[in-house]
């Protein structure tokens, strides 16, 4: 069956709506609760902790039927600068869906990075880039064996999270979150408020206030 290219929904978030999330860490976004699409933390960045720039951009999705990677190939001509390639390979661990050649092409196009719920290879190269970020569940040296099946720009499941084309994807050392356009619009004020509270807590603790005072803990009792 040939690769299916779906027409994506209009990516109708404004640059301003997207930009406000650029300062929000994944942990703060996830603290919003069920509205935030937490992606399985087992999908990890290739770069070491502390050296991982933020992954940030709207999703272009592919569903692969590993060991076939046809959908990834077709996505190369669809994805646009600043977007994130989200590869649903159903957690397949034995065959890489992408390596340095295709990732290098995406990098040259100005793509923000990729997330693979499956395997990647050539990680020495991929992990050395600080302007193209790669998250993957698995690493394997074995390459794909077909390019005839799959689909592009449809809802997929990445790490147990439903991800649709146009969702905002944020990644950092702690993991990944996917936010629907509705959540991007309606929960940014809550995320910014949480970030402000965390800054307030840090300042209060540094000033010498007790944890009980800062966090409003109930009085303790003596045994």
Residue spans of the language-model regions?
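Feature captures the catalytic cores and cofactor-binding loops of soluble hydro-lyases/lyases
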Residues: 1-165, 171, 179-223
């Amino acid at each position: 069956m040939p690769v299916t290219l779906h027409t994506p929904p209009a990516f109708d978030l404004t640059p301003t709506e997207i930009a406000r999330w650029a300062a929000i860490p994944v942990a703060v976004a996830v603290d919003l609760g069920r509205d935030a699409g937490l992606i399985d933390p087992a999908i990890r960045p290739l770069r070491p902790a502390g050296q991982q720039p933020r992954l940030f951009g709207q999703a272009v999705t592919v569903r692969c039927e590993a060991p076939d990677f046809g959908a990834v190939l077709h996505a190369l001509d669809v994805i646009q600068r600043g977007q994130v390639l989200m590869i649903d390979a159903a957690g397949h661990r034995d065959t890489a869906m992408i390596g340095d050649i295709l990732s290098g092409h995406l990098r040259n196009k100005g793509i923000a990075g990729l997330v693979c719920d499956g395997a990647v290879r050539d990680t020495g190269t991929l992990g050395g880039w600080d302007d193209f970020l790669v998250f993957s569940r698995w690493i394997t040296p074995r390459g794909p064996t077909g390019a005839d099946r799959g689909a592009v720009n449809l809802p997929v499941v990445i790490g147990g999270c439903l991800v649709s084309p146009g969702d905002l994807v944020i990644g950092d050392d702690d993991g990944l979150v996917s936010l629907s356009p509705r959540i991007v619009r309606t929960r940014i004020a809550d995320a910014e408020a949480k970030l402000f509270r965390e800054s307030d807590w840090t300042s209060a603790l540094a000033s010498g206030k007790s944890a009980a005072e800062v966090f409003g803990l109930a009085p303790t009792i003596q045994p």
